[in-house]
UniProtKB/Swiss-Prot annotation:
Protein name stated in the entry: Beta-enolase
Phosphoprotein keyword on record: yes
Encoding gene per record: ENO3
A Gene Ontology cellular-component term: phosphopyruvate hydratase complex
Main location: cytoplasm
Reaction equation(s) it catalyzes: (2R)-2-phosphoglycerate = phosphoenolpyruvate + H2O
Amino acid sequence: MAMQKIFAREILDSRGNPTVEVDLHTAKGRFRAAVPSGASTGIYEALELRDGDKSRYLGKGVLKAVEHINKTLGPALLEKKLSVVDQEKVDKFMIELDGTENKSKFGANAILGVSLAVCKAGAAEKGVPLYRHIADLAGNPELILPVPAFNVINGGSHAGNKLAMQEFMILPVGASSFREAMRIGAEVYHHLKGVIKAKYGKDATNVGDEGGFAPNILENNEALELLKTAIQAAGYPDKVVIGMDVAASEFYRNGKYDLDFKSPDDPARHISGEKLGELYKNFIKNYPVVSIEDPFDQDDWATWTSFLSGVNIQIVGDDLTVTNPKRIAQAVEKKACNCLLLKVNQIGSVTESIQACKLAQSNGWGVMVSHRSGETEDTFIADLVVGLCTGQIKTGAPCRSERLAKYNQLMRIEEALGDKAVFAGRKFRNPKAK
């Protein structure tokens, strides 16, 4: 089924920054997709095209990307008469038309916007739900509901507190269904709010970009202690484990790490990667930490490798791998991590996202699907995680509508699957294992 019309516009994301939205029309109707955007971005990500016109949106406008779709990509696709079911052909055509390594001609935000809309239209054309269409594109016969990783305490570049590490997450792995995982997550979240309010005052329960709390604490183990207390208070010590996203590239300074990077710089307090690794090992020993993302800088390969060989938990590459097949292959070869963080806008098309996921899985890695800190009401990644059977998703706290949009969509998908719904639970690292 051919595309009839492609139209892009500039909308605002959850942080009040412009982003790209695409409407694609076929005989089956209108299919709309919006592109997310990150705050802590890896230097190897595909290029997000911004206008740079300081008189509009502080230079963050996306009218150039929108124009690339409306004047170039859209007309070229309509002329080519590709079917919306042929995701790979459509994506390949756009990537070749762009012709750059990192999509800098049109912008990954332009190409991805069209790619996502095409995927939604393709599902409608086949008359199947989006998650089933994605599963077909990936060659997956089964469908799996993921364990949600709720980012409930925020630090790093996402928050105005002193906390260096960016995300402290709870994973209800002991739940029996996705819906139950949502309830457990929400209950722990509310208990956490009470614990923080009692200890630090009401203003400490204001929420960050992803709906988590950002109390003004400096010590990272204090955040873990708060989680432990809230999990106990909610009555789920046997069902909830902890994940972290350190985003260490944000505080890497001349070969060392600064755990107080939001204060005036003082090289005397910078620590080595090895020392930081010891700190993580203490966290693993003292708390139910099962997953650590970006524990070291995106180019500090040697430290990643030596750390991975000394722990048996999930070590996730995000800034390290940026959903890019070349970086993933490098990380596999160096044995740097054992899980990929999958962000569609880091690579810039649905096809390449699926390829990155399959490359990681074929090397025995786990895969965690992820939102960005600047999100929209678009729910594509909810269907994506079910279709790709990755078993885990992080899309913020159970708070703020742009986060709940994804979680609520996952509850609907579970409901639609009925008896056939399979929840990853404790097998979140390798949900396909029988």
